[in-house]
């Protein structure tokens, strides 16, 4: 599993066109599973590491409920059970918020510093299960010194 995540993080960096690929190394930091039930949510937050100011996070959706329940707040812009990313430039030609209704198998990789959160859902006793991994991006010279 570790090799799969590391490969995804490396591909993300390549697609971003960053030169960090040559000068830095990916170090997988920690992994965890989240089980969330109706009414539970994950407030907006970002990730950090004691080892690096630069890193990547990921979330893989392993299980999702059959329904996220009736949309009460604003049916035109649903949010029940959605994953939301917040960031980017704040002007009219930029998307500063991205919200998605995740399905089993959806996999997202994003920078540590990207603010994100998960909305609560209702109408079911089924679980939403995710697997997340954090990855530090450390200078190769720092790793050799250890």
Question: Model-found features: residue ranges?
Answer:
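Signature of the catalytic double-stranded beta-helix
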Residues: 1-54
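Catalytic core of non-heme Fe(II) oxygenases with the double-stranded beta-helix
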Residues: 34-109, 113, 119, 125-127, ...
């Amino acid at each position: 599993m570790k090799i799969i995540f590391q490969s995804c993080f490396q591909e993300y960096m390549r697609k971003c066109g960053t030169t960090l690929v040559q000068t830095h190394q990916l170090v997988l930091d920690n992994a965890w599973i989240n089980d969330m039930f109706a009414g539970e949510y994950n407030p907006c937050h970002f990730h950090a590491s004691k080892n690096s100011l630069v890193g990547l996070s990921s979330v893989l959706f392993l299980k999702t409920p059959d329904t996220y329940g009736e949309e009460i707040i604003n049916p035109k812009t649903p949010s029940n059970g959605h994953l939301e990313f917040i960031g980017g430039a704040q002007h009219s030609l930029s998307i500063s918020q991205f919200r998605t209704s995740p399905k089993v198998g959806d996999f997202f990789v994003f920078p540590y510093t990207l603010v994100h959160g998960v909305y609560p859902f209702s109408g079911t006793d089924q679980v939403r299960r995710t697997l997340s991994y954090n990855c530090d991006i450390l200078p190769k010279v720092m790793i050799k010194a250890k």
